[in-house]
A protein has these predicted regions:
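A generic structural signal for short, solvent-exposed coil/turn residues
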Residues: 11, 39-41, 79, 113, ...
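Accessory C-terminal segments flanking Radical SAM cores
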Residues: 129-239
Length: 239
């Protein structure tokens, strides 16, 4: 959207904003304007930058040729303008390898000027291309009334948010391609109950609000925005 920078500047006058991006097309003039807008606002501007591997060999087969190098350039640019992007990666490796993979992410990010990286790991959603690559949801992978009886449904994004698009207002960003996720043409029309019956709802239930900004609780990442330390800072920034 050619008006996105202006939209974000306006948004910051009224509340916080988060940009979900692959980081490959960021421009200095955009970030300079957004930096100024955030500095003048009482609210924060977050960037969530999707990278699904710590190298071209691991990322590009998923996101496309050349995307890793362009994304890393985007990370460096964001850090240059004082933003601390949440690096978001879908776990396409064995869970037992988390520490090793996070350590490799950290090494690469530090090499691009991001000294205290914030990393958010997402579970694999068995929809879209992933359904063809591995498998779809199994018959038993659905939510039941019993599972929800003592569950705080505020942890589910659909309980308090909606997604506004040029095709209508949807219940959540994950189900945006599902016809039943379109709840109307306005926010008021969309404020109706939604039956959480999709397989993706099961994953969201398992892992909490996977679309929110909290970064990984792993010791290799930090959940609080901090200023990048200079090159002389200690190297063990694991908390």
């Amino acid at each position: 959207n050619p008006e996105m920078v202006d939209i974000l500047c306006w948004t910051l006058q009224h509340g916080p904003a988060t940009v979900l991006t692959n980081g490959t097309v960021l421009k200095e003039e955009w970030l300079a304007k957004l930096q100024e807008a955030e500095q003048q606002s009482r609210y924060s501007l977050e960037f969530r930058l999707s990278i699904d591997g710590f190298s071209s060999e691991t990322n590009d087969p998923i996101r496309g040729d050349g995307t890793f190098d362009r994304a890393m350039a985007g990370v460096s640019l964001l850090c240059e303008f004082g933003f601390l992007p949440i690096i978001t990666a879908t776990r396409v490796w064995d869970e037992e390898s988390d520490l090793e993979v996070l350590a490799q992410f950290k090494t690469v990010l530090k090499a691009h000027g991001y000294w205290r990286p914030r990393i958010k790991l997402l579970p694999t959603l068995q929809i879209g291309a992933e359904e063809n690559r591995t498998r779809g949801y199994l018959q038993h992978e659905v939510l039941t009334d019993t599972m929800l009886s003592d569950f705080d449904q505020h942890n589910l994004v659909c309980s308090h948010s909606r997604i506004v698009t040029d095709r209508g207002v949807h219940v959540c960003p994950i189900l945006i391609e599902s016809p039943d996720s379109n709840l109307g043409q306005s926010i008021s029309e969309s404020l109706v109950p939604f039956e959480i019956k999709h397989g993706a709802c099961y994953t969201c239930y398992q892992y909490g609000s996977i679309c929110t900004n909290a970064s990984s609780g792993n010791t290799l990442s930090t959940t609080e925005p901090t200023v990048n330390p200079p090159d002389t800072a200690r190297e063990d920034g694991d908390t």
